[in-house]
Each structure stands twice: as C-alpha cells, then as structure tokens.
C-alpha cells in the first residue's frame, strides 16, 4: 500500500504584495495630489512607487513612505537643437521607465498629468497594465487627453472640466481636490469682522514680480478711497523687490510683512480676510480647504491657460473673483478690494461657497484604486 502524502504548494503570485505606481512631477501642482493619494496607502500593505523628476525631488516630505524613482525630465522645446536634445532625452526616459515598470510589475499606474506622466502611461499601455489619469486642473491637459481613451478611470478634481471627449464621459469620476492631510486639517476661516483688514498676497514661483508692481499702486489708491482703513498686508516678494515695497508700505503708514517664502501658512490663512494670488491647482485646493476667498490673477503663460479655467470655475460658483493679468489695473484692483472691505458679507458668502467644494478627494480616489486592484 502506497501512503504518499501530497503537498500543496501555494502559488506565490496569489500572495504577492500589491503595488501601485504614481507618475507625477514637473511642478508641485502635479506632485502634491500624488503625495496626497500616497498618504492614503501608508497604513496598508500596498507598496507605493513614485516616478518623478529632479525638480520635484525637493517636495518629497522627509518622513514619506514612498519608493521614489527620479529621472531627468529637463525638456526645452525652444529652438531646433533644444527640441532634438529634448526628444532624445524623453525617448531615453521612456525606455528606462518601460524597463522599470516591467520590473516592478505594478497592479495599477496613476498618472497626474504633465510631461512626467507620459513615459509611465505609455509603459502602462505597452505592458497592458490598467491605469488612471487624474486631472487636478479645470482643463484636461495634453498628456491626460492623449491617454484618456485607454484609461480605466478619468479622475477629475473639478466637476466643471468640460474638455473631456463625449466618448470618455462614462469613465469619469469626480473626486474633488486631492490634498495632503497637512492642508486638509488646516483650521477653517470663521470670521471676517475684524476691524483690521488682513490681505495675503502671493504669486508663487511664476509671477510674484507683477504683483510687486501693481499691488502697491492699488493699496495707495485704496487708502485714498478709504483713508481710515486699518489694513495689514502679508506679501510674498523677491529679495530684489523687498526694500522698495517696504519703503512704499512704510510711507503709507500700514502694517506689513514681506518675505520671499512663508512657512507658517496655517497661521496666515487663519488670520487672512482676502487673498490675492495665482490660480494653480494647489493654491486653489488650499483655499477651498480653509475657506479663504481670493481675487485670482491667473498666470497668463500657464499651459493651455489652465489657471484661467481654474479661477473661472471658482468665480462661477460665487466663491472668488477672477481678473486676467492683461486686463487688470491698479484702479480696478483697488475698486474691488474697496467693495469687499465695505461689504464683508460678500467675503462670508464666498467662504461658504468655497467650503461647499471641500471633500476628501484623496480617499475617494484611493477607494477607487482598491476596487480595481483587489
């Protein structure tokens, strides 16, 4: 009698850890939503890989649990020689990314738009890995449009995004903004009745210079319209402009704080009545989460004018105000600030409308990812 014992050997593939790849970079506006999504997987056994570029390496938090893969995506598409070099460099990155993703074998790839997501989404198509495109702006960018047809899901931060093909609408999910917990948990602005009107002005890395020119003129005119106004200005300025602005504000007799960069954003937001800023995705998402209304001056050279579409989505929901840079004068800006100072109810209503847009988009998208890979 043969008493052989048959051993059951588990299939290692059935017990392989799940993994995802996030492809984001170029600017913080593309990277920060990816970091927000990565946070949602920190307490899971899912491995999170990030494919990004050298420029965005500095944005990675010190305590992150992400496996970063950093490539040189420096592209310069002006002049024939630069275009040839950039296309060669992009081709090289595409090959390296294809080999990397082939080795990682992720269960899904999420691309956050911009040229840095292109190689990863291309690899996903070649290797037949399911992927999601996520658009944090109110206008579907080139890279996301290119891959939308093949994507499993098109995740949008704005319900107002209108340039999605009618054939792709069935794949659209509206997540809302993807923001990191450090932003999502900022205190909400709850009063606009302080005697001192507090203005926070920042232009980001793309355009603080023009603000340094037009804001002082507008404030000078504002104080002529309302001589007794108590105002405090917190403004992001370059080192080159700091001395000149300091002199102007000092002569106007107003309180001010000038700096090239601010680390205490939570404190500043909690004390601010009105923001004047660009309308990049990250800026708008922060203001939505804290409920601080803004006058938006979109960066006029943003890719496909997406900052204008972001700002108009906010204005159309009565949550802020938008002025194109080429149409804005110190007089127009002074008149608008004067109107808002005189009628604080407008600020309160705008704040409520902003907060109505607030949700946890990162969790929503994380749940969507889990449904696909599990």
Regions found by a protein language model. Name each.
Residues 321, 326-360:
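Conserved donor-nucleotide binding/catalytic region of nucleotide-linked donor-dependent transferases
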Residues 106-108, 270-285, 292-293:
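Acidic donor-binding loop of glycosyltransferase active sites
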Residues 47, 55, 125-186:
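Active-site-proximal region of nucleotide-activated glycan assembly enzymes
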Residues 2-6, 339, 359-374:
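C-terminal alpha-helical cap of glycosyltransferases
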Residues 16-25, 42-89, 239-241, 324-326:
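Conserved nucleotide-sugar phosphate-binding/catalytic loop shared by glycosyltransferases and other
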Residues 42, 49-51, 56-64, 187-274, ...:
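Donor-nucleotide binding loops and adjacent catalytic segments primarily
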Residues 79-108, 126:
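An amphipathic, basic-hydrophobic alpha-helix
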Residues 22-35, 56, 209:
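A short, glycine/small-residue-rich beta-strand->loop->alpha-helix junction that serves as a flexible
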């Amino acid at each position: 009698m043969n008493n052989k014992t048959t051993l059951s050997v588990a299939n290692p593939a059935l017990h392989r850890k799940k993994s995802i790849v996030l492809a984001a970079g170029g600017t913080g506006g593309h990277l920060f939503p990816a970091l927000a999504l990565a946070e949602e997987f920190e307490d899971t056994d899912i491995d999170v890989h990030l494919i990004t570029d050298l420029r965005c390496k500095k944005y990675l938090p010190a305590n992150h649990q992400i496996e970063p893969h950093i490539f040189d995506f420096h592209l310069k598409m002006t002049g024939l020689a630069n275009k040839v070099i950039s296309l060669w460099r992009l081709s090289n990155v595409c090959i390296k990314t294809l080999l990397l993703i082939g080795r990682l074998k992720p269960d899904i790839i999420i691309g956050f738009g911009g040229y840095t997501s292109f190689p990863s989404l291309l690899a996903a198509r070649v290797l037949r890995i399911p992927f999601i495109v996520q658009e944090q702006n109110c206008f579907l960018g080139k890279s996301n449009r290119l891959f939308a047809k093949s994507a499993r899901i098109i995740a949008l931060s704005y319900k107002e995004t209108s340039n999605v093909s009618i054939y792709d609408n069935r794949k659209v999910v509206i997540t809302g903004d993807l923001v990191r917990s450090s932003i999502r948990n900022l205190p909400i602005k709850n009063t606009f009745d302080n005697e001192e009107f507090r203005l926070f002005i920042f232009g980001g890395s793309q355009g603080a210079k023009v603000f340094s020119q037009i804001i002082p003129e507008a404030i000078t005119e504002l104080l002529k319209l309302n001589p007794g106004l108590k105002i405090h200005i917190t403004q992001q300025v370059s080192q080159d402009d700091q001395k000149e602005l300091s002199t102007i504000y000092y002569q106007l007799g107003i309180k001010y704080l000038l700096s090239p960069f601010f680390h205490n954003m939570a404190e500043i937001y909690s004390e601010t009545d009105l923001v004047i800023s660009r309308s990049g995705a990250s800026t708008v998402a922060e203001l939505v989460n804290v409920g601080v209304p803004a006058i938006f001056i979109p960066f006029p050279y943003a890719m496909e004018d997406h900052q204008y579409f972001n700002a108009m989505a906010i204005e159309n929901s009565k949550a802020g105000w938008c002025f194109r840079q080429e149409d804005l004068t110190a007089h127009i800006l002074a008149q608008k600030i004067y109107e808002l100072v005189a009628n604080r109810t407008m600020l309160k209503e705008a704040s409520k409308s902003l907060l109505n847009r607030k949700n946890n988009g990162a969790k929503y998208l994380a749940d969507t990812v889990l449904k696909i890979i599990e």
